[in-house]
Amino acid sequence: MLSFVDTRTLLLLAVTLCLATCQSLQEETVRKGPAGDRGPRGERGPPGPPGRDGEDGPTGPPGPPGPPGPPGLGGNFAAQYDGKGVGLGPGPMGLMGPRGPPGAAGAPGPQGFQGPAGEPGEPGQTGPAGARGPAGPPGKAGEDGHPGKPGRPGERGVVGPQGARGFPGTPGLPGFKGIRGHNGLDGLKGQPGAPGVKGEPGAPGENGTPGQTGARGLPGERGRVGAPGPAGARGSDGSVGPVGPAGPIGSAGPPGFPGAPGPKGEIGAVGNAGPAGPAGPRGEVGLPGLSGPVGPPGNPGANGLTGAKGAAGLPGVAGAPGLPGPRGIPGPVGAAGATGARGLVGEPGPAGSKGESGNKGEPGSAGPQGPPGPSGEEGKRGPNGEAGSAGPPGPPGLRGSPGSRGLPGADGRAGVMGPPGSRGASGPAGVRGPNGDAGRPGEPGLMGPRGLPGSPGNIGPAGKEGPVGLPGIDGRPGPIGPAGARGEPGNIGFPGPKGPTGDPGKNGDKGHAGLAGARGAPGPDGNNGAQGPPGPQGVQGGKGEQGPPGPPGFQGLPGPSGPAGEVGKPGERGLHGEFGLPGPAGPRGERGPPGESGAAGPTGPIGSRGPSGPPGPDGNKGEPGVVGAVGTAGPSGPSGLPGERGAAGIPGGKGEKGEPGLRGEIGNPGRDGARGAPGAVGAPGPAGATGDRGEAGAAGPAGPAGPRGSPGERGEVGPAGPNGFAGPAGAAGQPGAKGERGAKGPKGENGVVGPTGPVGAAGPAGPNGPPGPAGSRGDGGPPGMTGFPGAAGRTGPPGPSGISGPPGPPGPAGKEGLRGPRGDQGPVGRTGEVGAVGPPGFAGEKGPSGEAGTAGPPGTPGPQGLLGAPGILGLPGSRGERGLPGVAGAVGEPGPLGIAGPPGARGPPGAVGSPGVNGAPGEAGRDGNPGNDGPPGRDGQPGHKGERGYPGNIGPVGAAGAPGPHGPVGPAGKHGNRGETGPSGPVGPAGAVGPRGPSGPQGIRGDKGEPGEKGPRGLPGLKGHNGLQGLPGIAGHHGDQGAPGSVGPAGPRGPAGPSGPAGKDGRTGHPGTVGPAGIRGPQGHQGPAGPPGPPGPPGPPGVSGGGYDFGYDGDFYRADQPRSAPSLRPKDYEVDATLKSLNNQIETLLTPEGSRKNPARTCRDLRLSHPEWSSGYYWIDPNQGCTMDAIKVYCDFSTGETCIRAQPENIPAKNWYRSSKDKKHVWLGETINAGSQFEYNVEGVTSKEMATQLAFMRLLANYASQNITYHCKNSIAYMDEETGNLKKAVILQGSNDVELVAEGNSRFTYTVLVDGCSKKTNEWGKTIIEYKTNKPSRLPFLDIAPLDIGGADQEFFVDIGPVCFK
């Protein structure tokens, strides 16, 4: 909502702009053309603007200030025109004139209708005292006075016995009134009309805009191998190579800063090779380098020995579960149980902690070349290759079967208008119907289609002034105002009913990496993983023997998995790792229960103005108007200004069938016809112009779940929410995806240029060097940020029994849980140590029994515990620490395929696959409206890992392409850890001699190197083309299966595969345990201002303004003449009046008056707004909805209480109940008085509305009180004087079905102010009962149950006092 100051500023700006425009035209001169001939008389003009209101009726009560009235007519319009005007059409609307002086008093109007009753006047002055009248008869007993002050507290009574358990409370009251819902769905489609005569085919429409991209199709069948592409053009020559062959690889020097390039020197003579320089100091640890290309497969490692399998012990006998005993000594490890039945698919397991790098194995001897393996699974999808040459067009596909009916599309463009139908036969005359009610004046019909332009007529005389137009339809709702400041959090509502299980949420963004967990036990050797980035240099191993370099063999198939090794002992806790990259956001957690209301925080700053909201929905379509008679076509007048849109008219009667008309112009496009058969794909149409954004249609029916959308942009950081409940400890997450490739490091400084040595001949490839020395371990990085809880892992092997945790605090009583699915058969764990006895928790309500799980194998009998006192069922304790490793169980059956892991980082580009078969043409999409150009989206996240595709055939090697331009230098990377020294590569062929580089600075003299043997100088050869891949060798004999080898080095990560189809929705997880209550959150910010109140009645119309002369005067506008008449200068009277009116309306919103039109929320709000007011009856509206359900209450400003009276306030006196049976409590409203409990209605408000207001009243208060007076005759109400006990005391029923009694639990006992019903005297007495509580949900009283009634001489009646909330 615009602020008061904003509104005023905007209005003043608009007035200033208009004045500036008028003044800017002062100096312009208008050229006069020759006067035209006078034309024929024009048609009747369009309806004029709304006329002025009639004279006022008799004065009603003053209402709140309304908005400004309609503008007055522009003054002196006729006089502003002369014969030299440009045209006779109406000029633009004049500025609003200043408010004129009051007009002369009009003639008295006719007698008005009786106005509504005015509000009660102020009380008159007290009249003089009258003469004393005669003494009247004695009056009836007066109403009871206000309750006296409470007496002094009596002596403390004996503690009564523990009361019986109370009944469960009633369900909570309804929640807050919801905000107004969206417009309902469109109604059902009407019956189809009779088929019209087939019109001539319309002109073909323009090509529609391309439809939205369809959902991704299923993978097509494997395509045929395409023909090899043509050889590429020969690339241009490469740049000049470096001088001479590469020398031996020295150790890396420290990276220098890049120097500025020097001037190009002349080519110098080739110098002799200088001595090798000394090794530089050790460089800092660099970042992991970019993934290199896939190397040749390594030699297979030697197979490890299979460990011996331990013998399984006999299963123990299942002991009966004993009561919790004292904490015993840990028992011995039980024997492994028998193999369990195959379990259900577990959830993805937690991320294992990264194991330490193993020592590098010795290279094995080269094995014989194996036979070619069977075709492997299709590799992961590589990045998109370059576009291939266009293939020949495929044959047209078979026609697809019709798809399932789609959701209703958006309204299409209107079709071509058909020719008019032939005139139908006249129907029989209908029976005359009864006279209908007088209809309201019909609204002008919609503007008809524009006729053909007539020949221009002569300019006619000015037409008569048209009739006064009807008021226009209410405008569409304006744009949604900017969001106000954040409001204070409301009181905690009652929990609503449990909603249906929602659809699984989208995968969230990648969350932050969690803290490094404690180092887990080393897992069993896994299969060969993908090659990771180079790890830090390991500890220097002993020098291995150098094996002979074997010939590179074909990549062998992965060997069978080795048997699972025994679980190792838990390692020491590792150092904290460096901060990881932010991981994807975890899935959205379930909504926590709302926290309690916090204290009010400081008011935040006013937020910046939000963008305009989308246009509101279209209003309801009006009814069609009456068809008017066809008039004779007059000559075309000049185009008038568009009039205001009239209201829709009453539907006309059915006309006679007309003659077939001439063929009309091409009409507006019609609605979409029924869905046709899919046509062939049309040629793409030209891009349409960006259309205006259409108005939002009504919400359609919910569509089926769409395909997974791309991740949205990361939103701005929202305000910190209140602290949630502490979740249970999450299971360890799955291993994180491989990080993205790091940025390229900065180029090192140029090294010292040595003198150029003679070009040596290319030497043979040297053997691999020994591994370098291990680097020292780096310092631990700072602790990482706390990660989001990982996804639930797959079910791990049963762990050993953990140490018993400390007893948990008693949790609150849990709600009744949903019936859980049948659990898996768990593996047999070790007998746990007996935990300490926890304090008894509240007993939760019993949930429905789950299906019995399959019997687990018997566990080992635990030690006999001491018999503990049986405690109430406690909630689950906190999760214990991880116990010692259990004995390895027998190998289970292989589980089903697990859920796909998170997507890996983008791998190196794969080879270009063969093109797939052309798909069949899809159905033509419906025309979409052209959208506005959106901003470029951010890079999407990597897609899900797809299923492995079929391998494509290897394409022929293309010729080398031209070298690309140099890319820009990337930003400087952080210093990475020093990588291991790679094996020496083979010496490449020497390049051509390059030009002589600039002289470097003088290097430090190195130690003298040993003289090398001088080789013969060879000629530098040209770089040869890549050879074709050789054919696979002949398959050898299938060798015996070797023992499983040790884990080889991780292979390179393959490219990401195509996205697989979305998996099925997972099952609903088990409900989590109820967490402990969170800390009370801080009080929220003040809420936004409420919606504006209804506008007041329009003010009287302004008097005729001075107006401006907008006709041409020959030289300049009349408004720009010297300002002799001050009345022509527009003042901002109207602006001031509007601003005052707005100010008053805002003022009434902020300070409620306690009237029916402007009620307060509670009496406390009234007292704060008007501290000078006195107690009395005022109107309040606790639910703050429409003021029609406001209630009239008594406000006690001395205490700030809001008091609501019962209706009726008393139950009449009589012998209500006759019974000779045993005495018992009988409810007055429920049993005796035919089910009518006490009611608290207010005039003009229904009982349901009153119940809602009472519910809000209870939520807004934190204290309530009420009293009730029991009038008795021979009936005990509280204490029986004969026996001295309270067994005959009445019972009261509170609002939440709680029973308030005379003795027992102090929270549910009432107090007695006066007890006059303690003995039977055959006379009337009374007992006044009062109940005060800080739980307002227990009041007001709804019923009373006396015990001592039923005799012929026993009577009673009840006065119900008001219930007061504070």
Swiss-Prot record:
Result, substituting residue 676 to V: In OI3 and OI4
* Propeptide residue range(s): 23-79, 1120-1366
**Residue ranges annotated for the Fibrillar collagen NC1 domain, each copy included:** 1133-1366
Instruction: Reproduce the UniProt comment on modification after translation.
Output: Prolines at the third position of the tripeptide repeating unit (G-X-Y) are hydroxylated in some or all of the chains.
Top-rank taxon of the source lineage equals Eukaryota
Q: What are the cysteine partners in each disulfide bond?
A: 1163-1195, 1203-1364, 1272-1317
PTM-bearing positions, type Allysine:
84
* Compositional bias annotation for Gly residues: 84-94, 538-547, 775-784
* Residues with Pyrrolidone carboxylic acid modification: 23, 80
Q: Which molecular function terms from Gene Ontology are attached?
A: extracellular matrix structural constituent; extracellular matrix structural constituent conferring tensile strength; identical protein binding; metal ion binding; platelet-derived growth factor binding; protease binding; protein-macromolecule adaptor activity; SMAD binding
Which keywords accompany this UniProt record? Answer: Calcium, Chromosomal rearrangement, Collagen, Disease variant, Disulfide bond, Dwarfism, Ehlers-Danlos syndrome, Extracellular matrix, Glycoprotein, Hydroxylation, Metal-binding, Osteogenesis imperfecta, Pyrrolidone carboxylic acid, Repeat, Secreted, Signal
Signal sequence span is: 1-22
Glycosylated residues, chain numbering:
177, 1267
Q: In the UniProt record, which is one GO cellular component term?
A: collagen-containing extracellular matrix
The record's subcellular locations are: Secreted, Extracellular space, Extracellular matrix
Instruction: Tell me the impact of changing residue 1087 to D.
Output: In OI3 and OI2
Compositional bias (Basic and acidic residues): 28-44, 141-155, 738-747, 1005-1016
Tissue range of expression?
A: Forms the fibrils of tendon, ligaments and bones. In bones the fibrils are mineralized with calcium hydroxyapatite.
Instruction: Write out the domain note.
Output: The C-terminal propeptide, also known as COLFI domain, have crucial roles in tissue growth and repair by controlling both the intracellular assembly of procollagen molecules and the extracellular assembly of collagen fibrils. It binds a calcium ion which is essential for its function.
Subunit and partners: Trimers of one alpha 2(I) and two alpha 1(I) chains. Interacts (via C-terminus) with TMEM131 (via PapD-L domain); the interaction is direct and is involved in assembly and TRAPPIII ER-to-Golgi transport complex-dependent secretion of collagen.
Q: What is this protein called?
A: Collagen alpha-2(I) chain
Species of the source: Homo sapiens
Which lineage is the organism of this entry classified under, starting from the top rank?
Eukaryota, Metazoa, Chordata, Craniata, Vertebrata
